[in-house]
Structure formats: C-alpha cells, structure tokens
Amino acid sequence: MARIVGVEIPSNKKVHIALRYLYGIGPTRAMEICKNTGVDPDKRVKELTEDEISKIASFIQQNYKVEGELRTEVMRNIKRLMDIGCYRGLRHKLGLPVRGQRTRSNARTRKGPRPSRIKKKGK
C-alpha cells in the first residue's frame, strides 16, 4: 500500500480510483492529478515507482487542501455561521436540514430518531 498525505491507499486499485480514498479528492480531481503529474490513471498503484508516488504527493500538497486541513476548514466555516447567528447557522445548531428541505414529514436523518412515546398500562 502506498502512503499519500498520511493515508494508505489500496495498491491493487487503479490510480484514479485509489486517489479518491483521500478526503477532498473526487473523480475529477483524481483525473486532473494524474494528467498534471504525467501518471497513467489506468495504472495500478502497486506498479507505480517511488518517484511517481512522491510526484503525486507533492502535487496534492501544493495545490489542494485534503484530509485534516480540509475537515478543519469545513468545521470552522460551520462554526462561523453558528457564531454570527445567521439562518444557516441556526439550522446547524438545531440539528435541522440547512438547505431548505421540508421537515414536517421527512428529515429523520438530520433530526435523529423519534422520541419514544410512553404507553399507558391497562390498555
């Protein structure tokens, strides 16, 4: 297994698929990384040389925020919304859908499980 930006990526997968194991890199960015570093995207990770792996790792570190850095930035952005008290921040605080979805009949994932009802004895 190759290690890129502190994450072990599977060695038996193709490069453009294996790069998606990094938080913040999807299909488009993975192909872009392969193109800019000159690595064949259909090559298996175990077939890569150390030079190619280091080239990919340095390109990612120079051009993208990934893993912990990206996670902290996203958390910081959400915290900022909550601190300024805007509508989106309030929805985050209350644990409700943020992007305008209906909540009367759906949104169970965001709201969590329904509170249990107490059953009366004797009925």
Curated annotation (Swiss-Prot):
Region (Disordered): 97-123
InterPro entries assigned: Rbsml_uS13_C, Ribosomal_uS13, Ribosomal_uS13-like_H2TH, Ribosomal_uS13_bac-type, Ribosomal_uS13_CS
A GO CC term attached to the entry: cytosol
Classification via Pfam families: Ribosomal_S13 (PF00416)
Range of residues in the leader sequence: none
One of the GO BP terms on file: translation
Keywords, alphabetical: Ribonucleoprotein, Ribosomal protein, RNA-binding, rRNA-binding, tRNA-binding
GO function term, MF aspect, one: rRNA binding
Domain of life of the organism encoding this protein: Bacteria
Positions with biased composition (Basic residues): 101-123
Family: Belongs to the universal ribosomal protein uS13 family.
Function according to Swiss-Prot or TrEMBL: Located at the top of the head of the 30S subunit, it contacts several helices of the 16S rRNA. In the 70S ribosome it contacts the 23S rRNA (bridge B1a) and protein L5 of the 50S subunit (bridge B1b), connecting the 2 subunits; these bridges are implicated in subunit movement. Contacts the tRNAs in the A and P-sites.
Assembly and oligomerization: Part of the 30S ribosomal subunit. Forms a loose heterodimer with protein S19. Forms two bridges to the 50S subunit in the 70S ribosome.
Stated name of the protein: Small ribosomal subunit protein uS13
Record organism: Fervidobacterium nodosum (strain ATCC 35602 / DSM 5306 / Rt17-B1)
Name of the gene: rpsM
